[in-house]
Design a protein with these regions (language model features):
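Transition segment at domain starts
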Residues: 26-62, 96-98
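Extracellular Ig-like/FN3 beta-sandwich strand-entry sites
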Residues: 64, 116-120
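An anionic, turn-rich surface loop/hairpin at beta-sheet edges
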Residues: 91-114
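Short edge beta-strand/loop segments characteristic of extracellular beta-sandwich folds
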Residues: 56, 68-74
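Beta-strand signatures of extracellular beta-sandwich domains
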Residues: 82-86
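Low-complexity, Pro/Ser/Thr- and charge-rich linker/hinge segments at domain boundaries
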Residues: 142-151
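Edge beta-strands of extracellular beta-sandwich domains
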Residues: 133-139
Length: 151
């Protein structure tokens, strides 16, 4: 009887430790962005507190293979020439770049991205003068990059 209780306690503790490890590692980490920013933008300043650029996505995606993301540019008074999308924790972190014309005013870009694991998804907008603006959203998803992609 004592052996059964001892084994049940060990099993219970093992289950708790697995749950704690999975829960701790499941959140998107902001620690990746400084390294990615340094590689792509070097020492350029990126402004994060703006209202005209927004990226949005689900808090938890049902599939990492097709995560819906929307990028909204409410007004192009800053003369944005391109918007790049980055997924911090993906093997290939640069997901897309959209080039805008001078005629672009209110922009709404809806797309689907593949995500390997929980990550921040970032939209970085660059102006004609070289200023950078960013909006980011954490999204929980997994397994999208490991699946087959029919091209």
């Amino acid at each position: 009887m004592r052996i059964i209780q001892h084994n049940l306690i060990k099993l219970f503790l093992a289950c708790i430790s697995v749950f704690i490890n999975v829960h701790v590692n499941a959140d998107a980490s902001p620690d990746i962005w400084p390294y990615l920013k340094e590689q792509v933008f070097k020492d350029r300043v990126i402004q994060e507190d703006q209202n005209f650029l927004k990226i949005d996505g689900p808090k938890r995606a049902s599939s990492g293979a097709q995560v819906p993301v929307t990028i909204a540019l409410s007004e192009n008074t800053h003369h944005i020439k391109k918007i790049s999308v980055f997924i911090d924790a993906n093997p290939g972190q640069h997901a897309a770049t959209y080039f805008l014309t001078d005629q672009s005013q209110q922009i709404l870009i809806s797309t689907r991205i593949r995500m390997e694991t929980d990550s921040y998804v970032r939209a970085v907008a660059e102006t004609d003068s070289g200023e950078l603006f960013m909006s980011a959203v954490p999204i929980r998803a997994s397994g999208g990059c490991s699946g087959y992609m029919d091209v």
